[in-house]
Regions:
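Cytochrome P450 heme-thiolate "Cys pocket" and heme-binding signature region
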Residues: 148, 329-347
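N-terminal membrane-proximal hinge/A-helix region immediately C-terminal to the signal-anchor transmembrane segment
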Residues: 2-137, 141, 160-172, 338
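Conserved cytochrome P450 catalytic core segment spanning the I/J/K helices
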Residues: 74, 151, 178, 210-251, ...
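Central I-helix of cytochrome P450 enzymes
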Residues: 193, 197, 201-202, 210-216, ...
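Conserved cytochrome P450 K-helix/beta-meander segment immediately N-terminal to the heme-binding cysteine loop
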Residues: 305-332
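Conserved cytochrome P450 K-helix E-x-x-R motif and the immediately C-terminal K′/meander segment
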Residues: 63-83, 213, 217, 245-295, ...
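Cytochrome P450
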Residues: 2-30, 89-97, 153-164, 174-199, ...
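Conserved, non-catalytic sequence blocks in retroelement Pol enzymes and Pol-derived host proteins
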Residues: 47-51, 65-68, 134, 150-158, ...
């Protein structure tokens, strides 16, 4: 009698053969992926050979180094050792070039390279696709629409409101400091910012810094009509609702005095140099680039523009850790791209 086609022995043999085929295909795909990663690493090594960096591990790059030490101190060490730029290996097959030289900055920001979506996509869920993440034509359109709203003449009406919000915060600080020498300011500054936005953008009456939480979503329409900030234009920056002080020769400063306070402007710029609001941005090169010193990078390389590193570069700013407002004194000269607290060029 012949053996049945559906016998258990033949069925097991069929399953075993299928597993062998699947295992073989998986092994082939794995080898192809390993070869692809190897070739990509070799391409990166060749592309970045002109940009030295500290020794890195073949698999996890410089990750261990950055895990053992804080990011900023380590960055400053690299800025001092490699004054213009250096390579940073994120993984064995992923790397970028960190730039903190004004000539390099000018070259990259003068182009229209796209933002690296593999990095910026994680910001979408946090801040949304706004002006910071837009690029190309959409960025130009949104920028063109928003720029008139931030014209100096329009912002004049809101100076009093902004100063009022800051004053409320400072009063709270005085009370808290008298109780404890330690004060965490982040939450207070965030609430002050919300207070300013509520007053200027939505004409909210009151202060979210002092109101109860249940009151913060109440009436936001103007009580007396007119635009937000109307009636505040003549307030001084130190004590609102006292116009005579603003008019006094030795009174507290008001909005009209801002242009006559060069040292205050110097201090603000020096603070922005030490602590830039935008510490770093990224660009993915869409075409090769050659820098003024002859070094070059091919298309596809990720470039990290470190404004924090630029502002703390001793070859650009002598004694960069010292707070020295005289760096921005009228008549002082510097590279056009040595001071970039809010980035520069097209987005």
């Amino acid at each position: 009698m012949s053996v049945s086609v559906l016998s258990p022995t033949r069925a097991l043999g069929g399953v075993s053969g299928l597993l062998q085929v699947v295992s073989l295909l998986g092994l082939v795909l794995l080898l192809l992926k390993v070869a692809q990663l190897y070739l990509h690493r070799q391409w990166l090594l060749k592309a970045l050979h002109q940009f030295p960096s500290p020794p890195s591990h073949w698999f996890y790059g410089h990750k261990k180094e950055f895990q053992q030490e804080s990011e900023l101190p380590l960055l400053l060490k690299r800025v001092e050792k490699y004054p213009k730029a250096c390579a940073r290996w994120l993984w064995g097959t992923s790397a970028l070039v960190s730039v903190y030289d004004p000539d390099y900055m000018k070259m990259v920001l003068g182009r229209s390279d796209p933002k690296p979506q593999r990095t910026y996509k994680y910001l979408n869920s946090w801040i949304g696709t706004g002006l910071l993440l837009l690029e190309g034509q959409k960025w130009f359109q949104h920028r063109r629409m928003l720029t008139p709203a931030f014209h100096y003449d329009i912002l004049k009406a809101y100076v009093g409101l902004m100063a009022n919000s800051v004053r409320v915060m400072l009063d709270k600080w005085e009370e808290l400091v008298s109780q404890d020498s330690h004060l965490e300011i982040f939450g207070h500054v965030s609430l002050m910012t919300l207070d300013t936005i509520m007053k200027c953008a939505f004409s909210h009456q009151g202060s979210v810094q002092t109101d109860r939480c249940s009151d913060q979503g109440e009436e936001v329409s103007p009580a007396e009509g007119g635009r937000a900030g109307e009636g505040e234009e003549k307030e001084d920056l130190g004590l609102p609702r006292h116009p005579p002080l603003c008019q006094s020769k030795y009174g507290l400063p008001c909005r009209d005095h801002l242009d006559q306070m060069p040292y205050t402007t110097m201090c603000i710029k020096e603070a922005l140099r030490l602590y830039p609001p935008i510490p770093v941005i990224g660009r993915e090169l869409s075409k090769p680039i050659t820098f003024p010193d002859g070094r070059s990078l091919p298309a596809g390389i990720l470039v990290s523009l470190s404004f924090y590193g630029l502002h703390h570069n001793p070859t650009v700013w002598p004694n960069p850790e010292v707070f020295d407002p005289s760096r921005f004194a009228p008549g002082s000269t510097r590279h056009s791209h040595a001071f970039l607290p809010f980035s520069g060029g097209s987005r």
